[in-house]
Regions:
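Donor nucleotide-sugar binding/catalytic pocket of nucleotide-sugar-dependent glycosyltransferases
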Residues: 144-196
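Aromatic "clamp/platform" in nucleotide-sugar-dependent glycosyltransferases that forms part
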Residues: 102, 282
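Short hydrophobic beta-strand element within catalytic cores of glycosyltransferases
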Residues: 299-302
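Nucleotide-activated donor-binding/catalytic signature segment of Leloir-type glycosyltransferases, i.e.
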Residues: 245-265
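A conserved mid-protein helix/loop that constitutes part of the nucleotide-sugar donor-binding site
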Residues: 32-33, 205, 209-228, 241-245
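Short alpha-helical donor nucleotide-sugar binding micro-motif in glycosyltransferases
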Residues: 156, 261-262, 269-274
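A charged, aromatic-enriched C-terminal amphipathic alpha-helix characteristic of glycosyltransferases
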Residues: 339-373
Length: 387
């Protein structure tokens, strides 16, 4: 496959109506972005695909009863209205249900799907039990771990298959009792794939971090690198519980700017404006933003804590750092690369990313085909008894 011949429609059409039910709003976090991108990626290959999830409209959350997420006021916990959810499932008449988030939203959806005899695929993206230690201590951390462990185990018991996007996450799913745990890849926003690719940068001068401003992302390593590399310019794009702290730090660093939340429509432009993307995370089940930068022919530096480094076909297009404390040192080394070295690495990164996207599409279509009800009109009618 050559880069110029890459096609977004190489996989055949299959019979199926796929319904994704998630409490992650589209593009508000990694999981929300994953399934919005997956819908676009599969829409030409299945009969129908739709997502039921909360939405942020005019800065107001809609789609259920919303509670603030402890430790992060930019995210919400959503409690679904079971009767509304039941009606939406009935109206769509799915042949397979995909549930990517634990908690009450996912559990209610799984129970409704199970009662109707619909096959369920669980997307296991985040090990919240590990994140709990970064946000809370003592009793609150213990309660959070217990809740998510219970929730994940309950979802796994109700599902036919569990998919995770790294070997580590597959192993964790196995330990928690998930049936048929398997590996999935990562789709990308179609704009990243079809927008004309700008030339590979001739040198490394402009550095980008893009993601949630949260403890697990280790954003302070980017601030420290900006202080240590005055000849480079740094941009931090995103929102999260650490935004105020990051903005305070950036106010005294001349070569660092903080953009805040960036609309999804600007992602291609933002990546193309920079030479290198950095992701120094302490916990990262995959790291989709790294794949996004790879497909735009940009240099990508990631920590070895990112799940993307477990993919041999992708590490050929990455530069992996074992310690975020040496981020500035590694950036300085990359700034000394020749134009040829940079071109070779960045074009290889794009080729790796394109192959991965195509492989992931085939995998998802295979899973949908495997668990598909052959006759959508035969789907049972969902009923919920009022008590």
């Amino acid at each position: 496959m050559t880069l110029s011949s890459f096609s977004l429609a190489e996989q055949p059409q299959i019979s199926g109506r796929v319904l994704i039910i998630s409490d992650a709003a589209p593009h508000r976090n990694g999981v929300g972005a994953y399934y919005a991108d997956l819908m676009d990626d599969l829409s030409d290959h299945v009969d129908a695909i739709q997502m039921i999830s909360p939405e942020l409209i005019d800065e107001k959350w809609q789609g259920g009863w919303m509670l603030p997420l402890p430790g992060d006021n930019t995210q919400k916990l959503c409690l679904p209205n079971a009767f509304e959810l039941q009606q939406k499932i009935r109206d769509f008449r799915p042949t397979v249900i995909v549930i990517p988030t634990p908690g009450l939203f996912g559990l209610v959806a799984a129970l409704l799907a199970k009662r109707a005899g619909l096959p369920i695929i669980i997307g296991f993206h985040t090990w919240f039990e590990k994140l709990a230690g970064l946000y809370w201590n003592g009793v609150q951390s213990g309660l959070t771990r217990t809740f998510f462990e219970f929730s994940n185990k309950a979802l796994f018991r109700l599902a036919q298959k569990t998919l995770a996007n790294s070997h580590e996450m597959v192993a964790i799913a196995d330990q928690l009792g998930a049936p048929n745990a398997a590996l999935m890849g990562t789709p990308l926003d179609q704009r990243l794939l079809i927008s004309p690719v700008v030339p590979v940068p001739k040198s490394v001068r402009r550095v980008l971090f893009m993601g949630r401003l949260a403890a697990e992302k280790n954003v302070m390593a980017v601030v420290e690198a900006a202080n240590a590399c005055p000849d480079l310019t740094f941009t931090i794009a995103g929102d999260g519980p650490l935004r105020e702290d990051i903005e305070t730090q950036a106010s005294v660093v001349d070569n660092l700017r903080v953009l805040g939340w960036v609309d999804r429509s600007r992602i291609v432009e933002l990546i193309d404006e920079h030479d290198v993307l950095v992701l120094p995370s302490q916990v990262e089940s995959f790291g989709t933003v790294a794949l996004e930068a790879m497909v735009r022919q940009r240099l990508v530096l990631v920590s070895d804590a990112c799940g993307i480094v477990e993919w041999p076909d992708l590490t050929r297009g990455l530069k992996v750092i074992s310690d975020s404390k040496i981020l500035a040192t590694e950036l300085s080394r990359c700034a000394d690369w020749s134009e040829f070295e940079l071109y070779s690495h960045c074009t290889r990164a794009r080729a790796c990313a394109l192959r991965h996207v195509q492989w992931n599409r085939r995998q998802w279509l295979d899973h949908i085909r495997e668990y598909n009800l052959l006759d959508p009109d035969a789907c049972p009618v969902l009923t919920v008894q009022a008590r």
